[in-house]
Amino acid sequence: MSTLHANTVQTSSGGPVTLTSQAAAKMYINFNGTGTVAIRDDLNISTLVDLGLGDYQLNYTTNFANISYVMNYGQKNATSGRIMVNGGGNNQADPTTSRSEIMAFREHSSLEGSFDPEFVYVTGYGDLS
């Protein structure tokens, strides 16, 4: 097996290399959704707004170029029951280039309904303005 060591990679004409099929996250957030919401870590989030039980709004520092960006959602909670996190918030608001809403709710439990998870994770992919 060979090992390649390099400080700089350039095209054959000496210019920068074009990276193709790159899809780095343009936004992410890890926050505590219980009590007073608190951001643990983030990229490109200006503010997090608690809109009510299980309902949150993410405002971006730099807008996305259009509303065709992709979002991934996740959560972790110590209680029983399955918790789902979806886009749109409780009022099913459409995302804009500058913000999106999410909602968390519990299924398959005697406490079914909107819920504030202890850990909420959101990642966004797309072009920025």
Which residues does each PLM region occupy?
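Short, surface-exposed, low-complexity cationic segments
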Residues: N63-K76
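Extracellular jelly-roll beta-sandwich "head" domains, especially the C-terminal globular C1q domain
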Residues: Q75-S129
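Intrinsically disordered, low-complexity segments enriched in Ser/Pro/Gly/Ala and basic residues
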Residues: M1, T11, T20, T79, ...
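Generic preference for hydrophobic/aromatic residues in regular secondary structure cores
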Residues: L4, V9, I45, M71-N72, ...
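Extracellular receptor-binding modules and their adjoining Ser/Thr/Gly/Asp/Asn-rich linkers
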Residues: S2-N66, R106-H108, E112-S129
